[in-house]
């Protein structure tokens, strides 16, 4: 492992991302694929780039990411959280800027479990008066 490599773990919903950052040209590799190949949706790509754009490091750092679990939106959120943590390890002065944007806080919202006697978590079966 390189000495000038920084690491951050990000989580969102049921996804977990491991993010490695090192100085480079702005290459983003997710599970051995490019950002454009991995995420078909432009919104997911935007979410991933947000912390880098905020601190103007898009072309200064290379990112190597492995992500598991969940769907597209959860994985994008987990990667964003991981990048934020790795950036804070890289330069602690970025913390306040990232905190202000709301990237440092882990989004703790999870899927609510289905209850017995209900159709979904809160959706009740149709009620018939007669």
Curated annotation (Swiss-Prot):
SUPFAM superfamilies, per this entry? Answer: Ribosomal protein S5 domain 2-like
GO molecular function annotation: RNA binding; structural constituent of ribosome
BP GO terms, sorted: translation
Q: What PROSITE patterns does the record point to?
A: RIBOSOMAL_S9 (PS00360)
Is Ribonucleoprotein tagged as a keyword? yes
Q: Name one GO cellular component term.
A: cytosolic small ribosomal subunit
Q: Which UniProt keywords apply?
A: Ribonucleoprotein, Ribosomal protein
Keyword DNA damage listed: no
Please give the family membership noted in the entry: Belongs to the universal ribosomal protein uS9 family.
PANTHER family documented for this protein: RIBOSOMAL PROTEIN S9, SMALL RIBOSOMAL SUBUNIT PROTEIN US9M
Tell me what this protein is called.
Answer: Small ribosomal subunit protein uS9
């Amino acid at each position: 492992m390189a000495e000038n490599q920084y690491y951050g773990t990000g989580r969102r919903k049921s996804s977990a991302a491991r993010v490695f950052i090192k100085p480079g040209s702005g290459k983003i590799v997710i599970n051995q694929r490019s950002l454009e190949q991995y995420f078909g949706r432009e919104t997911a790509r935007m979410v991933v780039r947000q912390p880098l754009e905020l601190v103007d490091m898009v072309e200064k750092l290379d990112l190597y990411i492995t992500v598991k679990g969940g769907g597209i939106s959860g994985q994008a959120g987990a990667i964003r959280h991981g990048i934020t943590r790795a950036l804070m390890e890289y330069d602690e002065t970025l913390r306040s800027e990232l905190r202000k944007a709301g990237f440092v806080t882990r989004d703790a919202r999870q899927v609510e479990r289905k209850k017995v006697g209900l159709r979904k978590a809160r959706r009740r079966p149709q009620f018939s008066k007669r």
